[in-house]
């Protein structure tokens, strides 16, 4: 008999002959087909093949992931190299800009000058309306000579002011309280004669070059009060043919004590045609003697806006002033 779980498709039915002719019973023999016998092992092998394919696919995915990871690592390395190169370029550029920057020497000077001017402005309580001091700064005004022999009382030289020329020397109230400056024309150009060797009054000169006095510091030490009481300078309209009157012996220290008005007077007397346009500029910036000696062509051109020719002339006069030389127009 054929089992219920099997079918005719999976078995081979064979009729078995009988030798009993009276019996109508027919016998069949059933055999399983060879294909059906090997069907279950084939199913197992197919499952194993599918497992291998899945494992191979997983391996391929892992390999691709590893390749992607390696690529990302290489990309990170390249990014690090690029960052190092960029930082190196930035450092090189900063070092280049620092080493090749424009050196403005006037910046520090400008800061000090502004600070100095501000400090002077705070200390200044009143505006100087005229060029006047307790001592006489005009060589055209004859005043009595000091009788004190102290070298610290040596008068300071200055320039001739045109507004003082029309003043009467005898009627000026300043004469009674101001000393007389040491006039360099009291000594000859080729032969130096001290005051104690001269007789009578001091001889004023109206012409001749500016002459330094090498013995100016020892004049008052050897000068007698008897000669000082008899000495009176003469009033002259012009000192040396030009408006400059500076002692070479004291010019190295005296210009630093000038006020703003003294600097303005220096500009007017030195070169009126070229330097008079700078008067208002110097007054607005309150440039005194110390600031004048510190001026350079860069400061004049870039900060004060002075023209090139005027700046060159003024620098030349400042250099001459530092050397203690007189200016001849």
UniProtKB/Swiss-Prot annotation:
InterPro entries: SAM, SAM/pointed_sf, SAM_Scm-like
Region ranges (Disordered): 125-189
Keyword check for NADP: no
One Pfam family from the record: SAM_1
Domain SAM: residue ranges: 258-325
Record keywords: Nucleus, Phosphoprotein, Repressor, Transcription, Transcription regulation
SUPFAM superfamilies: SAM/Pointed domain
Flavoprotein in keyword set: no
PTM annotation (Phosphoserine): residues: 138, 238
Any one annotated GO CC term: nucleus
Location of this chain's protein in the cell: Nucleus
Feature: compositional bias, Basic and acidic residues: 159-168
Family, per entry: Belongs to the SCM family.
Known role: Putative Polycomb group (PcG) protein. PcG proteins act by forming multiprotein complexes, which are required to maintain the transcriptionally repressive state of homeotic genes throughout development. May be involved in spermatogenesis during sexual maturation.
Name of the molecule in the record: Sex comb on midleg-like protein 1
Protein species of origin: Rhinopithecus bieti (Black snub-nosed monkey)
Lineage of the species this protein comes from: Eukaryota, Metazoa, Chordata, Craniata, Vertebrata
Gene this chain is encoded by: SCML1
């Amino acid at each position: 008999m054929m089992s219920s779980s099997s079918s005719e498709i999976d078995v081979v039915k064979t009729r078995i002959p009988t030798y009993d002719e009276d019996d109508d019973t027919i016998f069949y023999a059933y055999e399983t087909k060879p294909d059906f016998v090997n069907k279950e092992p084939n199913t197992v092998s197919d499952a194993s093949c599918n497992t291998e394919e899945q494992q191979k696919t997983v391996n391929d995915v892992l390999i691709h992931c590893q390749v992607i990871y390696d690529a990302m690592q290489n990309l990170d390395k390249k990014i690090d190299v690029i960052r190092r190169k960029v930082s190196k370029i930035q450092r090189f550029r900063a070092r280049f800009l620092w080493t090749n920057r424009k050196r403005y020497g006037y910046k520090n000077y400008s800061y000090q000058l502004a600070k100095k001017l501000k400090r002077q402005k705070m200390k200044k309580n009143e505006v100087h309306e005229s060029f006047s001091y307790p001592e006489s700064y005009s060589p055209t005004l004859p005043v009595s000579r000091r009788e004190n022999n102290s070298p610290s009382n040596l008068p300071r030289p200055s320039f001739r002011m045109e507004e003082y020329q029309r003043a009467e020397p005898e009627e000026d109230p300043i004469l009674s309280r101001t000393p007389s400056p040491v006039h360099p024309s009291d000594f000859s150009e080729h032969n130096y004669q001290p005051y104690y060797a001269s007789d009578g009054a001091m001889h004023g000169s109206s012409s001749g070059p500016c002459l330094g006095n090498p013995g100016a510091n020892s004049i008052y030490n050897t000068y007698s009060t008897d000669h000082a009481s008899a000495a009176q300078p003469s009033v002259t309209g012009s000192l040396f043919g030009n408006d400059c009157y500076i002692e070479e012996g004291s010019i190295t220290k005296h210009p630093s004590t000038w006020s703003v008005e003294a600097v303005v007077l220096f500009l007017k007397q030195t070169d009126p045609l070229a330097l008079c346009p700078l008067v208002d500029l110097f007054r607005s910036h309150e440039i005194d003697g110390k600031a004048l000696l510190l001026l350079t062509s860069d400061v004049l051109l870039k900060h004060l806006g002075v023209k090139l020719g005027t700046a060159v002339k003024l620098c030349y006069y400042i250099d001459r002033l530092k050397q203690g030389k007189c200016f001849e127009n």
